[in-house]
């Protein structure tokens, strides 16, 4: 989703760190007995199928599209083909049905509700694309639920696991993932985390 590194050819030129980093992630998850879903882009699956099979042996594997293109940059037809291709690839590699999805950059906005209809058609039953605040690539600041809930569009219902937020001065402030782990002071992270006994979703990219 970054114009400076959009092509697969450019990705191939970067240093390979996935094996070392995945071992660290697996170790942390095991030591803390933490559940996880890995939303995998198709390019990673094609390039490192052994890693995807290793993930699937212990954790849920979900689709993150083929090449991390933002939803609102695509037509309905292109989005359907994109997600369908990624699901087929992941299912062929893992031998397991793919039922979870996260949009690149949390790029399903209020105006892209049609994406849920397509996801449902493709067999997706759990989504984690809703970013209930403003975001550079999308976001749904009008979304009010801070716990697992349902999204509805044209008669379909899908289980949604939204990103966690705090409401401060009337605004939704996200804190539990990505760059927010670096921006939010640790004392606040710890305090807000402890104040989420019912549901806490953390994410890393």
Regions found by a protein language model. Give the residues of each.
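Catalytic alpha-helical scaffold of carbohydrate-active enzymes acting on polysaccharides/glycoconjugates
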Residues: 1-169, 184-205
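Binuclear metal-dependent hydrolase catalytic cores centered on His/Asp/Glu-rich metal-binding motifs
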Residues: 173-187
């Amino acid at each position: 989703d970054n114009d400076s590194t959009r092509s697969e050819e450019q990705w191939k030129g970067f240093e390979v760190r996935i094996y070392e980093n995945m071992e660290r992630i697996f170790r942390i998850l095991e030591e803390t007995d933490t559940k996880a879903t890995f939303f995998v882009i198709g390019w990673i699956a094609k390039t490192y199928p052994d890693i995807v099979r290793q993930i699937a042996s212990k954790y849920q594997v979900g689709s993150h599209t083929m090449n991390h293109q933002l939803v609102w940059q695509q037509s309905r037809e292109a989005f359907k083909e994109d997600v369908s291709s990624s699901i087929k690839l992941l299912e062929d590699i893992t031998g397991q049905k793919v039922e979870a999805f996260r949009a690149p950059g949390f790029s399903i906005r209020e105006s892209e509700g049609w994406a849920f209809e397509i996801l449902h058609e493709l067999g997706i039953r759990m989504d984690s694309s809703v970013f209930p605040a403003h975001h550079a690539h999308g976001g749904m600041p009008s979304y009010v639920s801070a716990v697992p809930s349902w999204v509805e569009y044209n008669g379909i219902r899908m289980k949604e696991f939204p990103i966690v937020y705090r409401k401060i001065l009337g605004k939704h402030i996200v804190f539990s993932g990505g760059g927010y782990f670096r921006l939010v002071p640790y004392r606040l992270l710890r305090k807000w985390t402890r104040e989420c006994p019912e549901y806490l979703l953390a994410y890393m990219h």
